[in-house]
Structure formats: C-alpha cells, structure tokens
Amino acid sequence: MKKQLFKRKLLYASLLTAASVAAAPVQAEKAQPSNCQPIKNTEAIAEGTRVNKQALGKWKNKKIHKINITINNIFDESDPAENKWIYRLANRIQVNTRENTIRSQLLFKEGDEVDPERIEESLRRLYKKEYLLDVKLELAEQCGDLVTLDLIVRDAWTIEPRISAGHEGGESSSEFGLRDGNFLGSGAELELIYKTDAERSQVDYKYRSENFLNTRWLAEFYHADLSDGENNRVILEKPYYSNNTRWAYGFEVETLTQVDKIRMGDSLLNAYSHVTESQNAYLGRALAINSKRTYRLNVGVTAVDHAFSHVEQTQQLPDAEQQFYHWVEVQRQTNEFKTYTNLNYIKRAEDIAIGQEFSVRVGQGEWAETDSMTRLIAQYSNALALQGNHLFKFDTYTDLVYTNEDQSLANSIWGLSGKYHYYVDGKNRWQIRASWDRGNNLPEYRELTLGEEVGMRGYPLSYQRGDNRYIVNIERRFYSDIHWFNLIRVGAVAFVDAGRAWQTGNGEQADHLASAGLGLRLHSSKSGNPAVIHINLSAPLVKDEQLDDYLVSVAVGTEF
C-alpha cells in the first residue's frame, strides 16, 4: 500500500513539476552608457586557464554592463590545415550552439557585480559540456565603473553516426545508429542506436537536457527495446547547478527487464529473468558555502524491487528483494580545482577537484515483506597535488544493508581504491591504480567479477568471480603530438595488470592472475564526447588450457 501511494505521489509530483517549467522572461534592452573605451588585454590568457584572473580581479565588485557571446565553428578556417572543403562542409552541416543555450547556463548576468570566483566556476562548468571544445572570457570595454565582457566558445562536433564493432575479453559487440549531443544547438542529447553484444541486442531511444527549455531543470526520457526485455527511465530534477545553489529537488523512475546470465570463463552457471523497479525522490538544501567547500543536507525516499523468474537455463532463482525506505544525507563538496593536460585525455585540459569530498546517507524502512532494515551508503574521496608533477587520488565507498530480523548484513558491499599519477615530462606519465572490494551475502547478479571488463587485460570477461576482489594496474603512458588530419590524437601505453577474485572460504580455487601488454589510444580532438578508443595486445602470464597466448581487444573507454 505504501509503495502504491508513493508511486502515485511521484506521478502527481512529475505533473506539477513539468507544469512549472517555463522559459526565462525576456529582459528589456538597456540604454547604452557613454564614454566607453576598449580595455587593452596586454597579457594573453595562460594555457590551461579560461580568463586572465589578475585582470579580472581589478574589476571585482564593479557592474557588468554587457556580455557578448561569440560561438566559433568546430574547424578554424583561418588555419590552413583546417581550411579544406571537408572541414568547411562539416562547419556548414553542424548546427552551432544557440546563444540562449550558453547564456541560460551562465552563473552571472548583465547588471551583476563582477565576482571572479563565480565567473571562473561558470566557465569551468561550461567547459565540461560535451558540445563545447573551448571557453574563454576577455574584458572588452569599460564605461566608467561598468565593464563589458566577451565570452568566446568553440563548438564541438556532436553529430555521431554510430557504426562500430569491438572485441573485448573474447566477446564481440557492435553499434549502428545516430547520436546528437547538441540537438539543434539546444545542448540536448538525442540518440537512436542499435547495439549488440554477447548477452543481448537492443535499440536505445534517449532524450536528455541539462538545461531543459533554457531553464535550470534537468530532464531525461529513455526507452530501450531489449531482445530479452526492456528498459524505461524518466528523470526530472532541479539539481545543485552551482556551488552556491541553495535548493535542489527531483525524482527518478526506472524499470528494467532483462535476462541475467551468470558466467565464469566459458561456463554458463545460471540464468534467469530479472525485473528491477526503482523510484527515488529527494529534496536538498545547502547548509554552508565558502570558496573552498560546500556542505549540503538532502532528504528523500527510495523504493527498489527485484523480482526473478525462470528461463530455459535457470539452475536456481535468487530470492526476491524489496526495499522501501526514507533517508537523510550529508554531503561535502570541494570547490577547489587544478587544471591538468594529458591526464585522462590527449592534449585536452581537465579540471580535477582537489581536496576532500564525502557523502553519508542513512535510511530506515522495509526489507522484503516482513522485515525491516537500516541502510548506509557512504563515499569518501581525497585528491592531493604535490610539486606540480605528483597527483594522488584516494576513494572509498560502502553500501550496507542491515536486516533487523536476522541481525546481519545482506547484499552489502564496500571497498577502496587509490590512483597515483607521476608526470615524467610533458608527454610521459606513470599511472598506478589499485583497488580492493568486498561483499557480504551478495546475490549472483551482484557478485564481483574479474576480467577485461574491470581492467584485467588479457583475460575473458568474468574469468573469475566471488565476494572478494583486488586489482592492480601499472601503466607507462605516452601522449604524442601526432594529430591525424587535425582530427585524431594518438597515444600509446605499456601496462602490467595483476588481480584476483574469489569466494570467501574458497580462495584456494582462484589463482592470482597477471598480464602484460601494449596498447594504442585514439581520441578525437574535435568531439566533445570523452570516448577514447582502446586497442590492446595483452598476454596472460598466469593461464590455463582455455586461454589463448594473447588477446587482441578493441573497445571504447571513457578515459586513456
């Protein structure tokens, strides 16, 4: 009954929220001031930055008279290397980002006082948008105590015909379709894609906008037809869109039906139909804000149901699982960033949050039909930059469910990871990454697997599984100056991996695995999509008769 009431409330909330979304009102044109003079920008904007901070600081607390926005094409036709017919054609085909799309996302507006920190944050958030390659701000004109700002952005290529095939962990996959990450210049994502892999085929339909109708609302509508089920998701949210946002609220509803196939190596251990229904709604408030950090308090309610049924290969069904609980959450967000180049991408600036961040969510409610539970979901991370060429990142997480009837943990998992980057020089990097995960009373579909899908290169998908896992990756990376056709950046990597996954009490049956190999990395310099193509040749150093001497994989990753 509670779940039905909750679902109805979500429906009513969605209708009311959707009705409240409206475009920003049009402001009347202001009178032009007199005695205006251009501002001489004597110092160029430093590489890896988006504004001359020193020059901007001189205008702190002065009024912004006007903000001019210039949106440049993807290809720079003033550059002879890019002034070719194919690039000029691409510039004509691409629908440039609309000025209103950019203006509606700025954290400052005409008539505001110049706030350097807020302007820098706004530029950083704009740069993260998939449809922009570059963002710069210049001081253009002064009119007494008024200042005019020039915002200059460069569009990214966002129309992506998806015709691809990959081979990873001994399994093949393919995609065919079309995706536009900046539909008609609105900043919205629209996709229609057909996908196949070893488990299933599916057709994805998706619309997502982080500034729905040029407002601060995020909206996503997703549907997928699966060969073994379907997936539907709706998100409507007014998030914390800046460090200084005081209120946030929203909801998400998702249903997923698919056949889970439990594999270990070449063996199919079990299979069953799995239906997941999840609903989540929250309300949040920023408690304390300063230039270094922001604290927030969120409250919400979550309902999750897992149901299972037989298919032809079913050996044993997991127990059904129902959760319905209210929760409260405290968050700490760092507001300090450091910009790096040649980190996760090739020749592209990246803003890395420096300092401590955490979130702690505690909830109580129903577990199954007759039991109650306490749930703890927590995350902590800390990034530390030392001497300009050392970057450390530490993360830990926990997701615990304590059932009151059994007085024990159920379907719980926790772990920690660390990552170290050492900058040898402008083109060469060392990266060491290590992680450990531990589960307790995990159902099969949530067990920890080890194979190429989690970075254990040279081994098939889900080669080992259990409730314990560790993995260590050591990489020597090379970020070259090669720029094929002014489109594709090229990098290379040599790597060694080690790891193991095993079941508690049965560890002697799982070997410690190791592999070594070489790889190429290809990254588009004109696309805002963070995808990186991985081409790896890896050899397992610990193997059995089932494994080949080497494994060639071609896959798309989210970073180098």
Give the ranges of each region predicted by the language model.
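Immediate N-terminus of the mature polypeptide
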Residues: 2-15, 23-407, 420-560
